[in-house]
Each structure stands twice: as structure tokens, then as C-alpha cells.
Amino acid sequence: MPLSYLDKNPVIDSKKHALRKKLFLSCAYFGLSLACLSSNAWASVEPLSVNGNKIYAGEKAKSFAGNSLFWSNNGWGGEKFYTADTVASLKKDWKSSIVRAAMGVQESGGYLQDPAGNKAKVERVVDAAIANDMYAIIGWHSHSAENNRSEAIRFFQEMARKYGNKPNVIYEIYNEPLQVSWSNTIKPYAEAVISAIRAIDPDNLIIVGTPSWSQNVDEASRDPINAKNIAYTLHFYAGTHGESLRNKARQALNNGIALFVTEWGTVNADGNGGVNQTETDAWVTFMRDNNISNANWALNDKNEGASTYYPDSKNLTESGKKVKSIIQSWPYKAGSAASATTDPSTDTTTDTTVDEPTTTDTPATADCANANVYPNWVSKDWAGGQPTHNEAGQSIVYKGNLYTANWYTASVPGSDSSWTQVGSCN
């Protein structure tokens, strides 16, 4: 968020390790029933990697949508949402794939004043995101991060040691730089922090802020960072930013860098005003068309247009209703969109790595009479669109066999671990 807000491409650069999916099963090893699978199966998120100007999840360019929390600063009001319950609700009710922990740094009540308290808030969110098969953005929420480079390095080293083996975690090392030089100020800071992270975590996605409140992505694209799995921040507010900023984004994409919208709003850039429906829809189309992942600002109940909730309530604002609909209908979902948990320590399930389609040892005869036949999908991305995929628990027939989706999938039935073969239709 701008400071004024405070005053009120190529060869796929995939993970070194093979892509794995984790299924957490509360039933017996592979003798599982469909009911068990749909209610207790867990798919860990796919690792993210940068390929040219796209971010890949596994081996396919995808984008995900979710929510940004408000500043974590003590006493600012948004910290009450830094809970496992909040994250689980986003997963279950919103079908969110991303949650962003916006850890305030220099301002009152932020990390520099209370490092332990703010770090604990971030870790609660990250731990809950991992438990709920979501991506978690660890955000250094600063407008002048170059002034605290050593603190940023120490913080992200600690985060990398704790979470570097989790594909869920994304490092956002600079929120919104002011009107400062990319090449002389932001880039040197970013290179130092990236180097420190990469010494511990060689491959998780790192996002770097860009000049002028993360709008001048075109400037960064002309002098990109020479490191792998780096994306660049684009922020917009639909009431303020329109086609001219999208043109900057197009130029950056044409120059070969990947973008990630870690913060966006339906209203004005100062957080006030009503929802700009036309520009919000234009931005959503732009992000979907270009596979740009995004997190909406802000899951909060402050008395302003950008907030998800009205003050001291769980009633959705105009913006909250709009954003929830956008996230729920986003074409790609992380992990299992159908389940959520608030306390992973109470989970008594068995952790089983599955690298291929899940099948029973001897598929039984299945009732296929009422099932769609591939490629006649069951679910739509948009209410008025054509069916494009299956959601968790939805079945489809392919080559005489009945398959059920374990999570959101548009792959060929039986071709990967997003499917379970229920039985033969013969």
C-alpha cells in the first residue's frame, strides 16, 4: 500500500528435486474408499518455478488467487486475522490458494520494534497455509527496505532455514519501493537478500518489489536480476490504475520477466472509495489471460473500501463480495480446494507420497450411467462459460473407466495423481 495510506522464459527452470504430491490418508494405505479419499486426501502444493515470463506450478504455467492480510503491526487492527482459523476459512470458504502475511517493518509496532511478536504472527499464518495446502507469501512490508538490508537478510535467512524445504513458501523481500532507482537502489538490495536466501534455499520463488509503489515493472524488466526463480511485483488499485499501468505490465512481460501481483484492490490506491467494477474486471481478465498470480488487499475490517469486512463484523463489504467471487472462480487451485484444517498437530493421518495416479489394486465395476464422458467436463471457470475442469469429488468416464478428481484438475483422467480410478464401466 502507498505511504499515503498510512496517514489516515526458454527452458523450464523446475525444482532440482522431482515433483512430488503428498496425500495424507486417514484410511489404510492404498485400500482406500472414495469417501475416504474425498474427505481426507491431501495434495501438497506444486513447487513454483520461473520459465521466461511465466510462473510454473509443476510442469504447467498456472496462476493462483488469494488474499493479503493487513499490516501485522501491533495495534493497527489487522493483527487479529493472523490466525490458523483465518487461513483455514480462506481455504474452505473462499477456495483461496494464496495467503500473504504482510509483516510491517519500520513503522510503529512493526518488526524492528517487536521482532519476536511479528515473526510469530507470520509463522502462524505460514504454518496454517502449509497445513491447508496453500501458498504462503512471507512479505517484508516496507517502503524503504534498502535502509534495513542487514535486518532483512537475517530475517529471510531464518525463514529459509525453517521453511526452505516447503514448496508452499514464497519470499517477498520488498513490498513497495518509493520513487527510487531500480538499478542503483532496489536491485543491489534485492541481490544481497536473494544471495542470502539462496545459500539456504536454492529454489523457492522470490518476489522483488519495483519502483514507484511496485508499478514500474517495465523499468525492472530492462535490467533484470541474474538469478533463478525470481518474479517481480506489480501492484494496482482499480479505482486509480487502468490501461496505462497494464501497458507497463505488458512491456515487462514482453521483455521476458515474470510478474506476481502480491497486492491489488478494487478501490482507490488510498484504500477508499467504492468498487470500480469495470476496471476490476479488466484487471482480472488481464491477470487470468497472462497467468499472473495475485493476492487481494486486504483481509481486514478497517472502515474503508478496500477492507474485506465491515468494522467489527464478518459481513462482507462490496469489495469483499466481489473479491470472494473472483477467488472462488479462479481456474487454478492449490492443493485440495475442498478441505481445511486449523491445527495440523491434531491430524492422525498417514503421510504417503504418491507420484502417479491413485488406483485400487483391482478396480471394481462402477456405475457410469450418469457420469460425463471425457472431455465433457463437469465444472466451469465462469458461470457463463463452458465446462473446463472437474473439482474434488466429481467423476468422469475415460476409456471405459470411471475416475474421480482428487482436487481441481483439467488433466487427462488417470494421467496423474489428481485422479483416482474408481472402477471399470464394463
From Swiss-Prot:
Sections of the chain in a coiled coil:
none
The opening ranks of the lineage are:
Bacteria, Pseudomonadati, Pseudomonadota, Gammaproteobacteria, Enterobacterales
Which gene codes for it? celZ
Q: Which residues form the signal peptide?
A: 1-43
Keyword list (alphabetical) reads: Carbohydrate metabolism, Cellulose degradation, Disulfide bond, Glycosidase, Hydrolase, Polysaccharide degradation, Secreted, Signal
Q: What does UniProt give as GO cellular component? A: extracellular region
Q: What is its EC number?
A: 3.2.1.4
Q: Which InterPro entries match?
A: CBM5/12, CBM_5_12_2, CBM_sf_5/12, Glyco_hydro_5, Glyco_hydro_5_CS, Glycoside_hydrolase_SF
The reactions it catalyses are: Endohydrolysis of (1->4)-beta-D-glucosidic linkages in cellulose, lichenin and cereal beta-D-glucans
- How would you classify this enzyme at the top EC level? hydrolase
Q: Which organism is it from?
A: Dickeya dadantii (strain 3937) (Erwinia chrysanthemi (strain 3937))
Q: Does the keyword RNA-binding apply?
A: no
**Record region (Cellulose-binding):** 367-426
Name assigned to this protein: Endoglucanase Z
Task: List every stretch annotated Linker.
Answer: 333-366
- Which biological process annotations from GO are given for this protein? cellulose catabolic process
